[in-house]
Every structure is written in structure tokens, then in C-alpha cells.
């Protein structure tokens, strides 16, 4: 059986009410992105960065998975190991929708990482204050997020799975961080979902939905069905 990859970005979680720094409002309005999202910023003022991620965790607690998260969870349940679910998002909305085996390329907001033993543990939506590593008891901790100027270890997993993928689906990402047009070219068939027209990106894909993911996801699910039957989208 052929394999499918769904790679998602901020456009997947935006309908749930989660904003990114590109929206430049809400939580992000109060901060300089490079001060709170870069390795340099973290070295200069770790408390400011950790406070920022505390605020993001609190925000995450107040939103819910949307129809697209739930549909992807259903698709994963149906296609199992033949569907790779990869996301650039650091939220837990796919998991809360019931999706299994999600690969988070840029880290996971509910988790902290121990700088002493490299252990990773989940604190849910709690604040960073007074936490200690359950493994080595160290309090030398940080958020488990890949910041600007840092390596993303999960990219190795992404590229490994891409070489096994026949249908590539890009959801809610502009291609500014990852070269999704290259990924589309590596696969037999490809589908693009973006909110605004982008001719330079569209030309690499076989099928395009320029619309909100909430209205596109059921069509994409049908495309997957058709692809698994006869190899077409």
C-alpha cells in the first residue's frame, strides 16, 4: 500500500484561535520575536523567554481542536502506518483530537527539557516555576521548543519519511520555513491547501485548495480515498 504524508503549519490551528508571530496581534504583539524565539534571546534573558512560553501554554489551555484536527485524527485511525502526520505546530491540538504518532518538527509546548540529563517531560499547561526533572531532579530546565538558530532533530525523521511518501499534502503553511514545493516534487502526487493565492508555490502541486482548512479537509479526505484506490487525486 502507498504512503501519504500530511505536513501542517499554522493554518491548521488558526481556526481554533491560535495566532503566530506572523499575525502580529494578541500575545505576539507584546514581544519582539527574536527576543523570545531565538537562542540568542534565550541566552540574554531566559526568564523573559520562559515567561513567554508560560503565557503560550496558558493560551493553549483555552482553545480546542477544530474540525480539521479531528478529521486528521480520523484519517490516521483509518490509514494507520500508511499516513505520516507531521506538523510545524508546537500545540497539542492534534493529540487532543485523538491523533496518534504526530511528529512535531519544532518541539512541543506542553513539554520541558532538562539541560542536565536531556530528559523530556510533560507539564501540561502549568507554569515553568519550581519545576524539576522527574528523572535527575535538576531544576536546570528549558521549554522543549526549537528556537531560531537551533537545530531541529526531527527534520531527519521528516526526510526519511518523505522518501517513503507517494502522496504529499501541505496544509496551512506558506513554505517560508520549509521548502514544501521541493517535497511535492519528490512525491508521485501532491495537494496544497493555503489561505491566500501563491502562484510560485501552486505550480509545484497537482491539486490546490485556496481556502480555510475547515472547508478543505473533507475534500482532501476524499482525495486520499481516491488516491489509495487508483493513484489519482
Task: Label each region the model flagged.
Residues 1-233:
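Conserved catalytic core of sirtuin-type NAD+-dependent deacylases
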